[in-house]
C-alpha cells in the first residue's frame, strides 16, 4: 500500500492506433477477428463536383414496396427543351454553358432520363423562354417586373 499515494496516477491502457492506421485494411480485419464492431461507409461522389443532389426522400423509397424509382422528366418536357433550344440556335453545349451546367445534364433532360430538379428546370426555362413546369408546358414564359 506504500506505492499508492494521492500524488501518483497509474494509467493502465495503451495508446490507441492513429486514424490512418485504424482505417487500414489490416486493422479492420484484425478488429473483425477480435469481434469488435466495425463500421464501414463508402464515400459518395468523392472527387466530383456534385452541385445538385437528388432531393427526393430516399428513406421513403426504401419503405415503398411497389415501384422503386424516382419520377423522371416527361418526354414532352424534353421535346419542349429541344425545340426551344433549337429555335434560339443553341447546341446542348451552348445551353449548358449558359445555365452553368454540364452538357450531360441537358442531354439527360432532353431524353427524359433526368430526375426533375426545380433549380435546373428554372434555369432552362429562363434560358429558352418557355415554361417547362405546371399546366402550360411549352407556352412562352411571362417575364414581368419582380414585385416585393
UniProtKB/Swiss-Prot annotation:
Pfam families named among the record's database cross-references = HTH_3, MBF1
Query: A cellular component term (GO) from this record?
Result: nucleus
Which InterPro entries would you find in this protein's record?
Cro/C1-type_HTH, Lambda_DNA-bd_dom_sf, MBF1_N
Gene Ontology molecular-function annotations: DNA binding
The UniProt entry, under Gene3D superfamilies, shows: lambda repressor-like DNA-binding domains (1.10.260.40)
Domain named HTH cro/C1-type is located at 81-135
Main location (coarse class):
nucleus
Annotated compartments: Nucleus
Q: Which UniProt keywords apply?
A: Activator, DNA-binding, Nucleus, Transcription, Transcription regulation
Q: Where is this region: Disordered?
A: 1-26
For this protein, the DNA-binding region equals 92-111
Role description: Probable transcriptional coactivator.
> What PANTHER family has UniProt attached to this entry?
ENDOTHELIAL DIFFERENTIATION-RELATED FACTOR 1 (PTHR10245:SF15), ENDOTHELIAL DIFFERENTIATION-RELATED FACTOR 1 MULTIPROTEIN BRIDGING FACTOR 1 (PTHR10245)
User: What name does this protein carry?
Assistant: Endothelial differentiation-related factor 1 homolog
Organism annotation:
Gallus gallus (Chicken)
- Which lineage? Eukaryota, Metazoa, Chordata, Craniata, Vertebrata
Q: Which gene encodes it?
A: EDF1
Amino acid at each position: 500500500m506504500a506505492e499508492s499515494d494521492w500524488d501518483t496516477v497509474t494509467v493502465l491502457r495503451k495508446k490507441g492506433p492513429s486514424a490512418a492506421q485504424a482505417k487500414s485494411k489490416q486493422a479492420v480485419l484484425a478488429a473483425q477477428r477480435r469481434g469488435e464492431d466495425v463500421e464501414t461507409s463508402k464515400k459518395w461522389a468523392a472527387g466530383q463536383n456534385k452541385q445538385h443532389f437528388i432531393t427526393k426522400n430516399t428513406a421513403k423509397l426504401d419503405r415503398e414496396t411497389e415501384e422503386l424509382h424516382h419520377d423522371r422528366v416527361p418526354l414532352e418536357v424534353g421535346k419542349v427543351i429541344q425545340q426551344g433550344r433549337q429555335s434560339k440556335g443553341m447546341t446542348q453545349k451552348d445551353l449548358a454553358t449558359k445555365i452553368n451546367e454540364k452538357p450531360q445534364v441537358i442531354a439527360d433532360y432532353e431524353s427524359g432520363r433526368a430526375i426533375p430538379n426545380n433549380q435546373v428546370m428554372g434555369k432552362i426555362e429562363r434560358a429558352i423562354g418557355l415554361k417547362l413546369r405546371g399546366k402550360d408546358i411549352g407556352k412562352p414564359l411571362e417575364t414581368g417586373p419582380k414585385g416585393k
